[in-house]
């Protein structure tokens, strides 16, 4: 299944996103990692206007006045604030100039233990924030194994330890 999915990623309008609790990474085929920024947003509390996202919002962390708040829209590997996650995805795709594709295909890494409801929230964030035509979800340990070049279709077992900002996962992967 996963090999069929990865073989579908054939042009540079296909995007892979590691939507992490601490950082968000975006990868594009042929370009590699094109964005690695903190998963944080600064918002004006009076008019709900977003003032900064990613690195810029991170610089404001702990230095805000009462009318400005910093938000981490993901907690423990899952979406805690749908609207802010959508806005963060939109901002990051705009920043890498990939939001002008008509409707990219997006693959997103997800923690292994999340619920169907949480999976749906992540999918909807990619569809809304990323204007995706198709969204695929892949468990983080599997994505980590593929990312370091492990042949996950082989019968040989591999232990993967994926340590993130909000979750740590340990998995044994074999055909």
Regions found by a protein language model. Give the residues of each.
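Nucleotide/phosphate-binding catalytic cleft detector across ATP-hydrolyzing
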Residues: 1-165, 171-175
């Amino acid at each position: 299944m996963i090999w069929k999915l990865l073989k579908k990623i054939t042009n540079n309008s296909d995007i892979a996103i590691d939507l992490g609790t601490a950082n968000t990474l975006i990868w594009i085929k042929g370009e590699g990692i094109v964005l690695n920024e903190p998963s944080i947003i600064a918002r004006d509390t009076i008019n709900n206007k977003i003032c900064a996202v990613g690195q810029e919002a991170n610089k404001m962390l702990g230095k805000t006045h009462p009318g400005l708040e910093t938000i981490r829209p993901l907690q423990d590997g899952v979406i805690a604030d749908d609207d802010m996650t959508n806005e963060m995805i939109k901002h990051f795709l705009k920043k890498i100039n990939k939001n002008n594709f008509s409707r990219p295909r997006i693959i997103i890494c997800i923690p292994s233990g999340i619920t169907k409801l949480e999976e749906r929230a992540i999918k909807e964030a990619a569809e809304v924030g990323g204007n995706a035509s198709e969204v695929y979800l892949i468990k983080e340990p599997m994505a980590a194994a593929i990312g370091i070049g492990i042949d996950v279709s082989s019968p040989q077992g591999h232990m993967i330890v994926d340590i993130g900002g909000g979750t740590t996962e340990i998995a044994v992967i074999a055909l």
